[in-house]
Amino acid sequence: MGKLRKNLLAWAGTGVAAACAVTMTAVPALSTPEPEAAGVVSASPYLYNGWGNPPSPTEVMNASGIKNFTLAFILADGTCNPAWDGNRPLDGQDKATIDAIRGAGGDVIPSIGGYSGSKLGEVCQDSQSLAGAYQKVIDAYGLKAIDVDIEATEFENDASQTRVLEALKIVKEANPGLRTVVTFPTLVNGPNDVGKRMIDKAARIGSDVDVWTQMPFNFGGGDMAADTITSTEGLVAHLKSAFGYDDATAYAHAGISSMNGKSDTGETVDQAAFQKMADYAGEKGLGRLSFWSVNRDRPCDGAPDACGGIDQQPWDFTKIVAGLQS
């Protein structure tokens, strides 16, 4: 969810945002057209085993009520082969995390890609081999859903965009019921030209992505709740244009992945702003609400991989996402 994930930036400023009370208003659950698979997609914040001091997922589940997590990040191991962070095997530490989450009644959606590292969409030379790499991840964990976080050159390059979309089409056809998420950067008014090109391409080739999730931050400031809603409305408008969706269907194919606390550029998403995003997501029936990251969703000790840089209680943002579970 931005450069803080692997290229930690110098902390901008030393002040901590003022305390912000969270009012947990009741809102409708997010859109769940296929309940078993959709649950892991619709409300699942990011958890990253390869960053800082990751929290125990079962402790977070018990304290917050969250059921599902998006696990970051699967990269290429130097070849067209998937590995956590490009170096941890699929059957290692991260599988133990998945087993623990499932043992506690939850589930996971792995995130493939991210801002940094060697991306499968660039290393794999064609859509068939890329689909094969995705399939290895699906088979390793018996997945109901996958997230492709497409950023940087993988996002900007037309050929790698095409490989990703074609590979997602292949794995959806090979795995009935599998849900696919594409997460990508955006502007205040919605997708940039590269994002629009990607969505238009998916419509042309028949790549049936279930949820297009924007990362509405690193805008440089402003009202983060209002800007997020504006950006999402821009996404919804383009989905309607590209696919011919009606309003309800377009909202169900749109998602938000915010960044709790301080963003890479020093913006602040506090609890009240994130609650407004959650209210909007529930009211509109969005297909997904997430944030970067559970690792940062706790009181701050000054390290950007361990906290969000604002005054908060443990798991404030995770609890907000949990409020949207079906």
Curated annotation (Swiss-Prot):
- How would you classify this enzyme at the top EC level? hydrolase
Q: Is this entry keyworded Signal?
A: yes
Entry protein name: Chitinase
Q: Which reaction does it catalyse?
A: Random endo-hydrolysis of N-acetyl-beta-D-glucosaminide (1->4)-beta-linkages in chitin and chitodextrins
Q: Among its keywords, does the record have Hydrolase?
A: yes
**Which keywords label this protein?**
Carbohydrate metabolism, Chitin degradation, Disulfide bond, Glycosidase, Hydrolase, Polysaccharide degradation, Signal
Active site (record annotation): 151 (proton donor)
Give the range the annotation lists for the signal sequence.
Answer: 1-35
EC numbers on record: 3.2.1.14
Q: List the disulfide bonds.
A: 80-124, 300-307
Domain of life per record = Bacteria
Tell me the GO molecular function terms: endochitinase activity
Name the source organism. Answer: Saccharopolyspora erythraea (strain ATCC 11635 / DSM 40517 / JCM 4748 / NBRC 13426 / NCIMB 8594 / NRRL 2338)
The GH18 domain extends over 40-326
Extract the PROSITE patterns matched here.
Answer: GH18_2
